[in-house]
UniProtKB/Swiss-Prot annotation:
Disulphide bonds in the chain: none
GO molecular function: galactose:proton symporter activity; symporter activity
Membrane topology, record value: Multi-pass membrane protein
Provenance organism: Escherichia coli (strain K12)
Protein name, per record: Galactose-proton symporter
Topological domain ranges for the Cytoplasmic compartment: 1-15, 78-84, 134-139, 193-250, 312-321, 373-394, 438-464
Function: Uptake of galactose across the boundary membrane with the concomitant transport of protons into the cell (symport system).
PROSITE patterns: MFS, SUGAR_TRANSPORT_1, SUGAR_TRANSPORT_2
Stretches of the chain found on the membrane's Periplasmic side: 37-56, 106-112, 161-171, 272-290, 343-351, 416
Species classification: Bacteria, Pseudomonadati, Pseudomonadota, Gammaproteobacteria, Enterobacterales
Keywords: Cell inner membrane, Cell membrane, Membrane, Sugar transport, Symport, Transmembrane, Transmembrane helix, Transport
A GO biological-process term: galactose transmembrane transport
């Protein structure tokens, strides 16, 4: 009995280590999102570019990410989750090198597209891999660790941007990504491949070997393998399954909708244009804007711990609903303050408090939980196709948000822009209550059975 307990502890440690290494992809994702906020003013100054070109510098990465996400389904299915992560790490190294050395804005935009390809591969593969590796009781927490790494990456980028801002060294801001990219590349060599990918390839011995390393007991590993075998009895897969099976189409639709909801909360507007938003709040000094951006990043990291604590205790659906409510309030009040005018130090502090409240709402809910849900709701035979659709949607929506914010400010005005995002968050509360299932402590195979039986989307996580 003591040996069994010792083995269980050893396997838990191994599972955590594997999940941590995979989540490092999120760190690079976050660094890529964060570095451009601080570098953009210096890039605009050096290359003398317009607001429209600045939007392209920001959104070119999202275009690359959408392309990378679309290609990742095929890549992940053919080569496996591990090799896909390896390819993503190589692209991160190459993209950051070219970005830092860009002689003109055209090369910089192309380099950002290359980085986007890396982010697309990572944002597709890492949550999928984590959902297939982690045991059901901690699956939400482990996938949320990926989002935590994103927020740590954003904070790290803001800190390095602030450090380099005193000399305007934007090339160093963009170049720091190389170091963690190399660490990820080394770390991936130590990862096992997904047991569900092995099973999909009919390599059941390999699947069992991985499960025996990662589960507390051999009985638990064998039970999980039996459930995986059962889910493989569906004859069609991918596009064929999408065409023939209306229940699978519902899951793909929900995944796409969830990613649209995440992006149109307005969070990445703040991530990409944080210094600009601080300027709107009355902070005209560049140093104040940069340190304000660091506070945004730190709040994002700390609030993500709330999600990790709640996701496997309180559940996905109530946490998500509360988050959208907090974000709607934050954006609504911020828009009202922009309308009235921010003329005093106390008004400035209150505006920043509303901004930080919005960030807490996102980081505790839509930030991690959308990735959790999208990786849970797709059936095994259609998982690569379904997550390709949802991840590509994430980046297309992300690109639209990044490419339109400055235009919205110029055409709608500051207050109306923030009110639009507040109204969208209210809409997302209603959509969550209507469509989103509770998947806490439910196996992926049980969710799949409910989906394929034709149960309502909001009920596919229900126990029989």
């Amino acid at each position: 009995m003591p040996d069994a307990k010792k083995q269980g502890r050893s396997n838990k440690a191994m599972t955590f280590f594997v999940c941590f290494l995979a989540a490092l992809a999120g760190l690079l994702f976050g660094l890529d999102i964060g570095v451009i906020a601080g570098a953009l003013p210096f890039i605009a100054d050096e290359f003398q570019i317009t607001s429209h070109t600045q939007e392209w510098v920001v959104s070119s990465m999202m275009f690359g990410a959408a392309v990378g996400a679309v290609g990742s389904g095929w890549l992940s299915f053919k080569l496996g989750r591990k090799k896909s992560l390896m390819i993503g790490a190589i692209l991160f190294v190459a993209g950051s090198l070219f970005s830092a050395a860009a002689p003109n804005v055209e090369v910089l935009i192309l380099s950002r597209v290359l980085l986007g390809l890396a982010v697309g591969v990572a944002s597709y593969t890492a949550p999928l891999y984590l959902s297939e590796i982690a045991p059901e009781k901690i699956r939400g927490s482990m996938i949320s660790m990926y989002q935590l790494m994103i927020t740590i990456g954003i904070l790290g980028a803001y800190l390095s941007d602030t450090a380099f801002s005193y000399t305007g060294a934007w090339r160093w801001m963009l170049g720091v990504i190389i170091i963690p990219a190399i660490l990820l590349l080394i770390g991936v060599f130590f990862l096992p491949d997904s047991p569900r990918w092995f099973a999909a390839k009919r390599r059941f011995v390999d699947a069992e070997r991985v499960l025996l390393r990662l589960r507390d007991t051999s009985a638990e590993a064998k039970r999980e393998l039996d459930e995986i075998r059962e889910s493989l009895q569906v004859k069609q897969s991918g596009w064929a399954l999408f065409k023939e099976n209306s229940n699978f189409r519902r899951a793909v639709f929900l995944g796409v909708l969830l990613q649209v909801m995440q992006q149109f909360t307005g969070m990445n507007v703040i991530m990409y244009y944080a210094p600009k938003i601080f300027e709107l709040a009355g902070y005209t000094n560049t140093t104040e804007q940069m340190w304000g951006t660091v506070i945004v990043g730190l709040t994002n990291v700390l609030a993500t711990f709330i999600a990790i604590g709640l996701v496997d205790r309180w559940g996905r659906k109530p946490t998500l609903t509360l988050g959208f409510l907090v974000m709607a309030a934050g954006m609504g009040v911020l828009g009202t303050m922009m309308h009235i005018g921010i003329h005093s130090p106390s008004a400035q502090y209150f505006a920043i408090a509303m901004l930080l409240m919005f960030i807490v709402g996102f980081a505790m809910s839509a930030g991690p939980l959308i990735w959790v849900l999208c990786s849970e709701i797709q059936p095994l035979k259609g998982r690569d196709f379904g997550i390709t659709c949802s991840t590509a949607t994430n980046w297309i929506a992300n690109m639209i948000v990044g490419a339109t914010f400055l235009t919205m400010l110029n055409t709608l005005g500051n207050a109306n822009t923030f009110w639009v995002y507040a109204a969208l968050n209210v809409l997302f509360i209603l959509l969550t209550l209507w469509l989103v299932p509770e998947t806490k402590h439910v196996s992926l195979e049980h969710i799949e059975r409910n989906l394929m039986k034709g149960r309502k989307l909001r009920e596919i996580g229900a126990h029989d």
